[in-house]
Amino acid sequence: MRHGKTGRKLGRTSSHRTAMLRNMVTSFLRYESVKTTDTRAKELRKLAEKMITLGKRGDVHARRQALAVVRDRAVVTKIFNELAERYRDRPGGYTRIIKAGYREGDSAPISIIECVRDISGTQSK
């Protein structure tokens, strides 16, 4: 039975999946937007939100936990200084996934995952 086994396998071994998600979260936090498949974006969102929440904690242990995943000091500094300050008053939901059609080669559904810019919580029309 598959009780308590959350997360998607993404057709990869566990080490390949972990490495891919680490690289993707590093790129996502550096550029604040990534174009990828729907399922990868959904897995990436979990990890990215956790990293930003660690940045909001701001202590040394949180910084070390973030470095264990991201492994790029410049990106970790950005998380703890810029992103943590931007989302200080926001209790989660730092990212959004926008459907972007289908990839030409294999018709895989493509999405753009990006950081939410509007921090007020209201939509502007």
Curated annotation (Swiss-Prot):
Do you know which InterPro entries this protein is assigned to?
Answer: Ribosomal_bL17, Ribosomal_bL17_sf
Gene Ontology CC annotations of this record: cytosolic large ribosomal subunit
What is a single Pfam family found in this protein's UniProt entry?
A: Ribosomal_L17
* Key words of the record: Ribonucleoprotein, Ribosomal protein
Q: Where is the signal peptide?
A: none
Can you tell me which family this protein belongs to?
Belongs to the bacterial ribosomal protein bL17 family.
User: Assembly state and interactors?
Assistant: Part of the 50S ribosomal subunit. Contacts protein L32.
What name appears for this protein in its UniProt entry?
Answer: Large ribosomal subunit protein bL17
* Originating species: Syntrophus aciditrophicus (strain SB)
User: Which lineage?
Assistant: Bacteria, Pseudomonadati, Thermodesulfobacteriota, Syntrophia, Syntrophales
